[in-house]
Amino acid sequence: MAVLLRRHAWAVGFSGLVAIGCSPSTHNGGRVRGEGHGPPSPVANGGAPDPSGFYRQIGMIAQSGSFPFVGQLRYLAGSSADSTLSLVTLSFANRSLTFTGDAGAQRAAYTVTLDVTQGTTTVRHVETHKQIRVASFHETQREDESVIFQQFLSLAPGAYSLSVSVRDDGGGNANVQQMSVTIPRLGPHTLSTPISVYQVKPRVRLDTVPALIANPRSTIVLGRDTLAGLYVEGYGLSTSARVDVAVLNDAHVVILRDTVNLVRQGDLSSALLDFPVASIGVGPVTVIASLASATDSVQAPLFLSFGDEFGITSFDELLSYLRYFVSPQRVQLLRDTPPDQRAAVWAAFWKQTDPNPSTLENEALRDYFKRIATANTRYREEGLAGWLTDRGKVYVTLGEPDQAGQQFGTNTTARGRAEIWVYTQYNLRLIFINQSGIAHPRLSSSSQADFDKLVRRLQSQ
């Protein structure tokens, strides 16, 4: 029986296969995601503290720098009691790669190297070379999750060191993460670690691998995804086995409980733990699963956000993004919400600010976060995210100006240059003055006052 978590269409299929403990060149998986799956990340553009440290803290694979990537290590039972099937998943952006023209399209190549060691002994070395091809230059500049890599490894239970290296073959970008890992033994009456997936077809034999497309970032995009899904397997269980599930928010408060029946097929049982996004709220959550009446449990992170790479690591961080969307008083009311009421209060806020309740999306919030992403690209200054600059905050609040132009002083030099934005709808004319000569325009005092007055009026409506 196929279990499919339907989120959105995929433009390109797998360019390879996945296999257990494979040799380097043939049995590996990569996938290029289709266009239009959320805005570029404000995090990637400096819109919030780099979340890679937080990801590593909760056991994920993550690096920032010139070649940022995010991923996870998940475990399923192997073909024997002395083997565990370990799944390494990675996600990174097209923009990290160097593309060259190829018959009207764009092509890039990358290498992923996995080294598993115990002391001075190399237990597994896998070097995978992949190529991707996109249709246009525009796609090469994407900063959202564009490439998904996944690799299954068969390893004996025990303690290891894992090195994950990703390199752009066409340029100098590269990054590496080293981490200590403990591979569990998954015997009878145990569960696999849950795997966040875009789609999955469960396996029926332990000597095979499930046909799945992993979600390395475990990100659920509000307005796009209606369900948050995790694939889990059970071993040596009866046909009536069930899994108890609890979802905890970032304050460690249980916000959802459920019981899911495992489906027995062949040698093993499996289930898709899926939850309505509206019942969870927004921000990071932890999903804990255990066999009914058992004391041991497994867990996995999920991040409910507004884009694949938004990197929102707490409810408070989400609220910091809303400073130009609603009044400070309204943000504070959300901030003061007790942790066990956040999901309900956020659902009410979503409904109140949704201009078109007949759709699954909140178009106002969707467009607002898209403007944050655009502002980070256009208006970023050294040490300051684009959406927090003067031009950025105006753009995020009001959108594209109806007219925009530049005006120079009598000396026609960059110093004293003025940039003028006009918003006809609001009868507003804003002047940004660049006194530094290094493209850091600031609102004039009168324009700042006019803008603040308009913002107060809009936020009071």
Predicted regions and their residues:
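Short hydrophobic/aromatic patches on the structural cores and recognition surfaces of FHA
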Residues: 14, 114, 394
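Residues within mature, well-folded domains
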Residues: 252-254, 266, 279-280, 303-461
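Bacterial N-terminal signal peptides that target proteins for export
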Residues: 1-12
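Bacterial N-terminal signal peptides
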Residues: 11-21
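Intrinsically disordered, low-complexity terminal regions enriched in Ser/Thr/Pro/Gly
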Residues: 23-282, 293-323
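Leucine-biased recognition of intrinsically disordered, low-complexity hydrophobic segments
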Residues: 4-5, 17, 114
